[in-house]
């Protein structure tokens, strides 16, 4: 247990930050999975909707500081490439 007031505050902040990051990490995985499942089922419309949702959320994670811009772009690009295989 923390002995100083500042250490107690840091511990509280760490807990809040950990919870927030867990939420973002879970959301990121679920969005990615939604696109992959739609592609696996061969449903192009569902895949495009899921990709649009993933793109929007990934870039909002960038603005919140959870992801770096390059990381979000790379993830969206890979998902878009996967969705484009349905068109062929």
From Swiss-Prot:
Q: Name one GO molecular function term.
A: structural constituent of ribosome
SUPFAM superfamilies from the entry?
A: Ribosomal protein S20 (SSF46992)
The superkingdom listed in its UniProt entry is Bacteria
Keywords of this entry: Ribonucleoprotein, Ribosomal protein, RNA-binding, rRNA-binding
Q: Name one Pfam family in it.
A: Ribosomal_S20p
Q: Which InterPro entries does UniProt cross-reference here? A: Ribosomal_bS20 (IPR002583), Ribosomal_bS20_sf (IPR036510)
Task: Report one GO cellular component.
Answer: cytosol
Please list the GO biological process terms of this entry. translation
The UniProt entry's coiled-coil ranges are none
Q: Where is this region: Disordered?
A: 1-20
Family membership noted in the UniProt record: Belongs to the bacterial ribosomal protein bS20 family.
Q: What does this protein do?
A: Binds directly to 16S ribosomal RNA.
Q: Please identify the protein, giving its name as recorded.
A: Small ribosomal subunit protein bS20
Q: What is the lineage of its organism?
A: Bacteria, Pseudomonadati, Campylobacterota, Epsilonproteobacteria, Campylobacterales
Q: Which gene encodes it?
A: rpsT
């Amino acid at each position: 247990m923390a002995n100083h007031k500042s250490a107690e505050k840091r511990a509280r902040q760490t807990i809040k930050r950990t919870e927030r990051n867990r939420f973002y990490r879970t959301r990121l995985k679920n969005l990615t999975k939604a696109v992959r499942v739609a592609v696996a089922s061969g449903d192009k419309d569902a895949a495009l909707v899921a990709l649009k949702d993933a793109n929007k959320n990934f870039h909002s994670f960038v603005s919140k500081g959870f992801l770096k811009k390059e990381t979000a772009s790379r993830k969206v690009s890979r998902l878009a490439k996967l969705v484009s295989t349905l068109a062929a």
